Regions:
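Hydrophobic alpha-helical segments that drive targeting, anchoring, or assembly
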Residues: 28-29, 38-40, 46, 66-68, ...
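NUDIX/MutT-family hydrolases
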Residues: 120-123, 132-166
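Conserved Nudix-box catalytic region and its N-terminal flanking loop in Nudix hydrolases
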Residues: 42-83
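A binding-site-centric feature that preferentially detects glycan-recognition modules on secreted/surface proteins
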Residues: 2, 72, 153-157
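Acidic, metal-coordinating catalytic segment for phosphate/diphosphate chemistry
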Residues: 1-39
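Short helix-loop capping/hinge motifs at secondary-structure junctions, enriched
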Residues: 46-47, 128-133
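Active-site segment of metal-dependent pyrophosphate-handling enzymes
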Residues: 86-130
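Class I (Rossmann-like) S-adenosyl-L-methionine-dependent methyltransferase catalytic domain
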Residues: 21-27, 99-105, 112-116, 149-152, ...
Length: 168
């Protein structure tokens, strides 16, 4: 079942738009999917986050843009390893949500995204407590930590994906 959990706007999209957070076990249309993220939870209920030391980033769910020819699950696994050092197989992931971004006015010159795009949200669950992990050398991330939900809510109150945290 597909269900809209929240709708909002964000300051990093330079035109009138709507961002919907959608709970769904199915992938969104592949031709509009631009990025993939993965919520990894361990047996203690903690979730692995990464810290990106760039303006506007900070603590976030590991993920990023798809590369040419890459599936959403392949991108999620690659980004997870690049940003946290944790390596999972694509088969360990399941789709549970996505974010749909729809531009409501024409995009400004130079805007690189289509008027309708999607960000896929995967989840994975570890059967044991998550081991300490760190981003590999050269990563854009400066740290990775297994955090309890209360701490995630403090650090990530502004994140569009926050309504999904309770669905892990």
């Amino acid at each position: 079942m597909t269900r809209v959990m929240a709708s909002r706007t964000v300051p990093w999209i330079p035109v009138e738009h709507r961002l919907d957070v959608i709970l769904s076990p199915d992938l969104p249309p592949a031709d509009g999917t631009t990025s993939a993220f993965v919520f990894v939870s361990d047996s203690t209920g903690r979730t692995l986050l990464t810290c990106v030391d760039r303006p506007g980033r900070g603590w976030d769910v590991p993920g990023g843009h798809l590369e040419a020819g890459e599936s959403a699950s392949e991108a999620a696994v690659r980004e997870l390893q690049e940003e946290t050092g944790l390596l999972l197989e694509p088969s360990a992931l399941s789709v549970f949500a996505w974010q749909r971004i729809e531009l409501l006015r024409p995009a400004p010159a130079g805007y690189r995204y289509a008027p309708l795009t999607y960000m896929v949200m995967f989840r994975a669950r570890l059967a044991a407590p998550g081991a300490a992990t760190a981003p590999p050398a050269g990563s854009e991330s400066t740290g990775a930590e297994w955090l309890p939900r209360a701490r995630i809510k403090e650090l990530c109150a502004h994140r569009t994906w926050l309504p999904l945290l309770e669905r892990l």
